[in-house]
Amino acid sequence: VLNKKTGEMETKPIVDLIMPSSKIEAVKEFINDNPDKKFVVFSASKKACYLAQAEFTSHGITAEVLSGDTKDSARREMVNRFVQGEFRVFIAVIEAAAEGIDGLQHATDTAIFLDRSWKTIKNKQAEDRLHRGGQKDTVLIIDVMARDSLDFGRHQRLQEKWAWIKAVLGDPGTAQKMITSGKDIAA
């Protein structure tokens, strides 16, 4: 890879997401086991979102992806179509859906995280797409991860970070205000 600042070539490890993915397979199986439900699936990776969509649709599960590339005008339309049942799985990049998306709570009570963002607040905001006025059921949040993996370690680190935020702020109400304002602290 060419370093644009120095003009020198650098060696960087490349992680390429490919199918099959055991995490996407597990989510697909869970969705198939619950044929009368709709789901929101989150990932920090746009590529993982599109891989999940391709896998789901190839097995008859209707799914659409919301990413940072989705125009504002299309976001509201996508949510409306999901609520109306035009597709079963709303797949979203965490950073793109954490703020400014409302209405998902009218369609489902289940969010599945293929992975989490390193930004604690963005994860909480993504979860809160379902924890909103109009939600009639208990919300189920599912994290797909393997023990002793990067995902497992990230999950533990994010839990520690969230506990620290609550301790520093002194009360859960203040932490909630921080979430809704969109402020985050560095990792």
Language-model segment annotations:
Residues 118-187:
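A conserved SF2-helicase RecA2
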Residues 102-116, 140-143:
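A short beta-strand element within the Helicase C-terminal
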Residues 84, 106, 132-135:
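Solvent-exposed polar/charged
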Residues 1-103, 172-187:
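Conserved Helicase C-terminal RecA-like lobe
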Residues 52-54, 102-106, 124-125, 155-156:
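Short amphipathic alpha-helical segments
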Residues 44, 68, 116, 144-146:
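Cofactor-binding loop segments of dinucleotide-utilizing enzymes, especially the Rossmann-like FAD-
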Residues 90, 110-111, 130:
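Short, well-ordered beta-strand core segments
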Residues 36-38, 108, 138:
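A general structural motif
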